[in-house]
Design a protein with these regions (language model features):
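Small beta-barrel nucleic-acid-binding modules, primarily SNase/OB-fold domains
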Residues: 2-131
């Protein structure tokens, strides 16, 4: 009985890590337009899920902060392979997804470092932003 109970107890109490990084696809990020939009070498445009960063253009633009955010994100992921968790596509045809590098959530890092904020309207799409 103990032989059956111990593995079951371990399975129930061990934390589950979402996502399973080894099963996520890998993409090569060419560059990032701003703090929440990147492009792969294949031309896929990725809108980083669950965050909002300052805009370069438009009514609510803050070009100085937007360039700082863009530079930070480019240092993190440009010209590098990252894992991607694709969630959906937006009305502009961009992939909405989470990026991971060395099993670290890029969006979470952007928010922690102050280059973006949790996009409350879509925060339910990402486990880390629900907390």
């Amino acid at each position: 009985m103990k032989r059956l109970l111990l593995p079951l107890l371990a399975a129930i109490t061990l934390p589950t890590f979402e996502p399973a990084f080894s099963s996520l696809p890998i993409v090569f990020i060419k560059d990032c337009y701003d703090g929440d939009t990147c492009t792969t070498i294949n031309g896929e445009k990725i809108r980083l899920a669950c965050i909002d960063a300052p805009e370069l253009k438009g009514r609510k633009a803050d070009p100085i902060l937007a360039k700082e955010a863009r530079n930070f994100v480019n240092k993190l992921v440009a010209n590098q392979e990252v894992s991607i968790k694709r969630i959906t596509n937006d009305r502009y045809g961009r992939t909405i997804g989470e990026l991971f590098k060395n099993e670290l959530n890029i969006q979470e890092i952007i928010v922690e470092k102050g280059y973006g904020k949790v996009y409350k309207k879509y925060a339910n799409q990402c486990e880390w932003s629900k907390q």
